[in-house]
Design a protein with these regions (language model features):
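Alpha/propeptide regions of enzymes that mature by internal proteolysis
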Residues: 1-236
Length: 236
């Protein structure tokens, strides 16, 4: 996996020659070092660790990522790595990761541009955990992925704020995602936010561009804690 200038080949020979050196340097500081080594145009490293106890057993889930420009699903120019120190069967692990990806890395946008390179690598190892505890592990993976994804969006090239789009009571999840992604990708919405202009028409317009059927009279719209529309009627 790699990111960088499109079209420039990776120096594979140099990488292979350094593998033995890197292996000899493995230690507890490696997590921090790796999170910094993968950065390109990023302004800050992105790493997150959670720890908990399940049935008396300490469980840790850790992750780090990079990404700043050319960020738009599916993942775009970003790298993300997750490790978990419990054993989980591959089929179950894959399904858990797929769920986490949909609500994290596949739900962010910086510039609406995709890329030729992206990778999400997740590894689990250790004693198998009982199935009854899998929902707790899923919650932990979701938390780590969302933290890293938001860190990428917050560190977007040229970004000075982070916008979170929340859609409630859509007909189904697919419709909700379409609306949220259309609003988050809209340059008109972004310029309104950048100019501190609560131009609610641009938000509704971006939602309407999706083709999802809804009635304006059913729409409540909040910008932050301030309600702008109630049942399609202007509140301010």
């Amino acid at each position: 996996c790699s990111t960088g200038v499109i079209g420039e080949p990776m120096p594979i020979k140099n990488l292979l020659n350094q593998l033995p050196v890197l292996a000899d340097k493995l230690d507890r500081s490696g997590f921090r070092d790796a999170s910094e080594a993968i950065l390109t145009t990023d302004l800050v490293p992105k790493r997150f660790i959670i720890e908990s106890y399940i049935a008396g057993r300490r469980i840790r889930i850790a992750g780090f990522a990079k990404g700043s420009g050319m960020i738009y699903p599916n993942m775009a120019t970003m790298l993300a790595f997750i490790v978990c120190d419990v054993g989980i069967e591959k089929k179950t692990w894959d399904a858990m990761l797929k769920d986490s990806l949909q609500t994290s890395f596949n739900s962010i946008s910086v510039d609406g541009e995709t890329s030729t390179n992206d990778s999400f690598i997740a590894i689990n190892s250790g004693e198998l955990i009982e199935k009854q505890y899998l929902p707790i592990i899923q919650e932990g993976i979701d938390m780590v992925c969302k933290k890293l994804a938001k860190s990428i969006a917050r560190d977007g090239e040229g970004a000075n704020c982070l916008i979170e789009v929340i859609v409630k009571n859509a007909k189904n999840e697919s419709d909700g995602l379409k609306i949220a992604k259309s609003i988050s990708k809209s340059m008109l919405v972004k310029t309104a936010i950048h100019g501190c202009d609560p131009n609610w028409g641009r938000i509704i317009g971006a939602a309407g561009n999706t083709g999802v059927q809804f009635k304006l009279n059913d729409v409540d719209l909040f910008i932050g804690e301030f309600q702008i529309l109630r049942k399609g009627k202007l509140m301010v």
